[in-house]
Amino acid sequence: MKKLTAVTTVGITAVALSLALVGCGSNTKTETNASTSITTTASKAAPTTSAEAAGPNKTIQDYIRENQIVETPIHRGDPGSPTIDLQVPPGWSDAGPSTPDWAYDAMVYDQPKVPDDPPRITAIVFKLTGNVDPAKILEYAPGELKNLPGFEPLTNGNRSTLSGFDAFSLSGNYMKDGKKRVIGRKTVVIPGQDGLYVLQMTADALADELGTLMEATTKVIDVQTTITP
């Protein structure tokens, strides 16, 4: 089984993952913020907060702004903080050069039903410093997905753990470019000596690829990902 290894830390200035974590559609993954964003344009450059999806549900970004918390995006290979090992499920591949600059890792399904719109799983990591309450991060984790156009939850969302660290997961359907899509995001809080690290993994695909995403996330990523602080 293939494995993606990320050694995460600080040192990169704050820039605009949740999915999300994910790109929606053919190599077009765009997040408005390192901490929570979903999708709209095909760009590998760091996006800005102005593109963040607005809505009635409070988000992690709202919490960060209201409490003047400093957010630092983390990239794979940065020395000095948690080591995160993501297993690449069978039938999936590392996204390679199509991985956005703001993501720490991404993977894509090899045999999609629609070749130019394959299922994707994208991970982002960021560090928060200041008056940060991990419980609040998990409380507001579902906000951005709930603000997506036409979002209909497949579950009520649930608290869980990933590699022993507290997490929150939510999945549902939403509309983009007139097409029904499925999206799921797991947000994980990882306490560190110099701040709170947050991992967000977002899976996104056309709605009829739900089974593909479920197979990858529940049978491989959720059970085989390891985090070493």
Indicate residue ranges for each PLM-predicted region.
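Secretory pathway targeting signatures of secreted, lumenal, and periplasmic proteins
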Residues: 75-132
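Bacterial lipoprotein signal-peptidase II cleavage site
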Residues: 6-7, 20-34, 38-47
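Bacterial N-terminal signal peptides
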Residues: 11-20
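Surface-exposed amphipathic alpha-helical segments
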Residues: 92, 197-229
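Bacterial N-terminal signal peptides that target proteins for export
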Residues: 1-11
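Short, surface-exposed beta-strand/loop micro-motifs that present aromatic residues
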Residues: 105-111, 182-192
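N-terminal low-complexity, Pro/Thr/Ser-rich intrinsically disordered segments
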Residues: 41-77
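Signature of long, low-cysteine stretches enriched in small and polar/charged residues
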Residues: 138-189
